[in-house]
Every structure is written in C-alpha cells, then in structure tokens.
Amino acid sequence: MKKKNFNKDTNKTPSFTGKDIYLYGKHPVSLALENKNRIVKEVLLLSSAQDKINIPKNIPFKFVSKEQLEAHVSKDAVHQGIIARCAPLPQLDTIDIIEESNKKEKDLVVILDQVTDPHNIGAIMRSAAAFNASAVIIPQNGAPDETGVLAKSASGALELIPLVKVKNLSRAMDELKEAGFWCIGLDGYAKRSIYETTLPKKAVIVMGSEGDGLRRLTSEKCDDTVKLPMNPKVESLNVSNACAVTLYEWNRQHLSGK
C-alpha cells in the first residue's frame, strides 16, 4: 500500500464532506493557498487588502464590498479583508497516520476525548503544529465541523497537520498502540508529575474535557497517566494550555536542540 503524506500530493482519492467552507484572515488563507490538499475555489477581497496576500494565478479572486464579504462570516470574525471559499479537506483515518509514523523513530499524536469547543480544538491544533505533532484525533460523534472559526483559532494549523475524526476512539487508541505508540493520559489525579516521567519516543497524548477530564474508560485504555504540577490555589488549566505544556515537555525530552 502506498504511504501517504498529508502535506504533499498523494494518490489517495480525496473524500470530501459537506459544503464549501469560508476561511478568513491573512494567515489561514495564505496557508490554505499553499496546501496542495486544499481546494481553494475563490478568494474574496476588500480592495484595501489586495497587497496583504499573494494569490496564485490559477486561483480566481474578486474584489467585493465589506457587506458582501461579511455575509459569509460571523459578525465578530477578524477577517482582515480576506476570505477564501474552499472545499473541506480530505478525510484521513488512523491508518494514514500510522503509515506515515512508520517512517519515523519518534512521533507525537494528540487525542482529544470530549473536547468539542472549536476554539479549544483550534488552539490545540496550533500547539500541535508548533510542537511537531503528526495529527490531532477526535471522536466523530460531537466533533465540530471544519469551519472558518476553527481554522482561525488554529491560525492555519489545519493546513499543516490533519484533524482526524474517528468513529471509535478506543479502537483508534488500540491501533496506535499496536503500531508502537504509548498512550499517555493527562489526569489531575495521576500519581506522578509529567516532569518525573520519561515520555515515550512514540507518544499519544490523551486529553479529556476541560470540565470532567478523562473519562474512566479512556483513562483505563491509557498505558500511563501523568499530571501537571501546579499551584494548589489554581484548580486547573484550560485544556488547550495544558496540552501545550505537555507537548512542549515531549519536545524538550526528545527534540531538544534539533
């Protein structure tokens, strides 16, 4: 079977879901235009924004009024005068991630259990891309659609690493473990701090919801659980912040100086 690369052309027939989406803002749109797996159908611009972005010659664009532009986004969207009408990205699965990981000695994947807020998922995508994760995996049930809000929160990271939606999170964890990954759950009640733990070279960082944390069955599926040591006066961190700290620590242990 031909191995696939998310950021390069592949022989995989794209599986697109849903209708067109509208990405907005200079950085998300610029990265979408650079992503060979993203079909950008049209770019809409305010005349004042024409010098902010380079549009390839093969991509149609047109100047529109502010009212026409903002008809495609929410009222509070920070669009910077730039919107791209796109097809959703092709859907990948756990096997695609494993095939790419087989080429690597070290790898990092994030699994989110019952994290459904698009702003949190977007922020986690941004941290995952910054700290060299290969993918973010979420359950299909209850997952937010790919939207401009999610893309803007991710600051373009949707174009850099895949957001994989799976029907069965437990099965996805089993598949990753069979492929040589260790699943490490972040749990405020864990006995050991992350700083007392040698994280595996191939790690799946499993994050639970901000309110309830890891579900019991998800925690039991993990090979180990760790906690972030914190000031006892602070009950918890936002899930995206906690994830960023954890991903940074894996990078410090395995990629420091590289």
What are the language-model segments listed below?
Residues 25, 113, 120, 236-238:
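Active-site helix-initiating loop/hinge in glycosyltransferases
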